[in-house]
């Protein structure tokens, strides 16, 4: 028999929410595990109202905790959006918690539009505390959608929308 896998973007259906899309993904993974699927992949996309899959490593942990034998992985983590050390550490933690069941798939595409890509990658360089207050303010603005009119990140939204 050919091994079967699922690639899940956690789609947000019309009239639903990102929260429900994530719950649907958890349910689908449990079903895939019961049906004998081999692997469950989670995608990384940002600032898309129709896709709730912005943080695959968090969902990987949730799915691995709710299933018994299914391998769970990222399909994929968009490496340009992350510090490689952080990716390695996150997946090593997942592997320590769920030995032999975690897969790391990586990609090079941004997984988003150019403006959101800029928001994801800005200030990845510099010293640890040079711009802490600026980063804190940016985090608050993203959480509250508080960028002023005309700001390039005005339409960038932390997903999923709940």
PLM feature spans:
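Short, intrinsically disordered, charge-balanced linker/junction segments flanking boundaries
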Residues: 155-162
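Glycine-rich, flexible loop/turn motifs
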Residues: 66, 75, 114-118, 152
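Acidic-and-aromatic substrate-binding clefts and catalytic sites of carbohydrate-active enzymes
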Residues: 46-54, 80-85, 159
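Glycine-enriched alpha-helix->loop->beta-strand junction motifs that scaffold or abut catalytic
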Residues: 66-69, 98
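Short mixed-charge
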Residues: 148-154
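Hydrophobic faces of well-ordered beta-strands that scaffold small-molecule active sites
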Residues: 4-8, 40-42, 72-75, 102-106, ...
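Flexible, glycine-rich active-site loops centered on histidine and acidic residues
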Residues: 3, 7-18, 80-147
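N-terminal beta1-alpha1-beta2 module of alpha/beta enzyme domains
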Residues: 1-67
